[in-house]
Amino acid sequence: MKDIVAKEATAIQSIKVTDAFVEAVNLLLNCRGKVITTGMGKAGYIAHKFAATMSSTGTSAFFVHPAEAGHGDLGMLSKDDCIVAFSTSGKSNEVLEMLGNASRNLGVNTVIGVTSHIDSPLRDMSKIVLDMGPDIEEPCPINTTPSATIAVMLAISDALALTLMELKDFTTSDYHARHHKGYLGSVTRPDTGYDES
């Protein structure tokens, strides 16, 4: 187990924070429309979590499932939106089809791609590419189950969300306004005497 954790930690530590990361933050900070996240499979779970983290920290965002996009959910997008697409291979047909249709049919052309493979078609469809690194070693015994790659995606998405949070001077009271339930709601609650739990 220690070896698995070590390999995932190594993958995260190998992320190269380049100028593309700064460009991505600025693009999201100045997005005139909505921030949309998407991804398929395990990458989709990271995209969904990214939207949830952004929404609770001052950047309104939501997840669109790429398969459902072809069945009407593409209509949730509009021209000024910014899409953040997650795919290690950059070859997931559902993601590529969604991005192609969003561009052709709705004029949505602002895409940040989070991907690893050098020959990833997602790179060509993205205005900004956040490179996960080309040689991420999966600790899986048969080298197939995505875990280190997913850990890298999670780290990249958290870095974006928390940097945006800082740039927006997001406060504890701002957080509580969006997240008033549970433990985090209780520790960020102003001393009003009103119990929102």
Locate predicted features.
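An N-terminal, well-structured beta->alpha segment
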Residues: 1-30
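Glycine-rich phosphate-binding loops that contact phosphosugars or nucleotide phosphates
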Residues: 34-164
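Internal, active-site/partner-interface "lid" segment
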Residues: 124, 137, 165-197
